[in-house]
């Protein structure tokens, strides 16, 4: 027999149970579960956990700047939450439509992970997986600059006028070549027989985050720069590569 459980938006912090064990990694920002959608029958299964970024009350209101950063962080968190809810609402609607049409077997999972977070940056990763015959995974990254409260853009990390896109892209190409030379099972679309598929350059919209070593980590989804079997590749750009152009 089919069984479905839908937990509606939380009205109390105590209801935010699924991520309540995650420690607060910054004094300002934390994550709770906004909604938990679960469904399972003989042909369909879904486990969709919708995270929500929350901002702690500003306890350091001694300065006008602190209050302004707190308000900006709240605004940024609201924007991120709206984007996440739009994504997950769409995925739930697609799942339910496919289920209603009895289109075969399907599985959908959405979860989140707090990535390496420092005193200055907070990053939430939304992980989506969908399978119906074959499977696909794709991710979204949300980084808040805790010193400004704004969502961090790649350009924010570099000196004005610097060609950071080329510098990062060249290093990624070098890493791709080194990985393929060391492991025949590693395949990237680089100098291939189908040049139109080859990786040429990242853009300002390419996903990234900063790890605990303050290194830029560039993230691709399945099929972006390699066959789907390679998963979602990530490339850590060494600090020394960007030393001359980072702010």
Model-derived segments and spans:
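Compositionally biased intrinsically disordered regions enriched in Thr/Gly
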Residues: 8-247
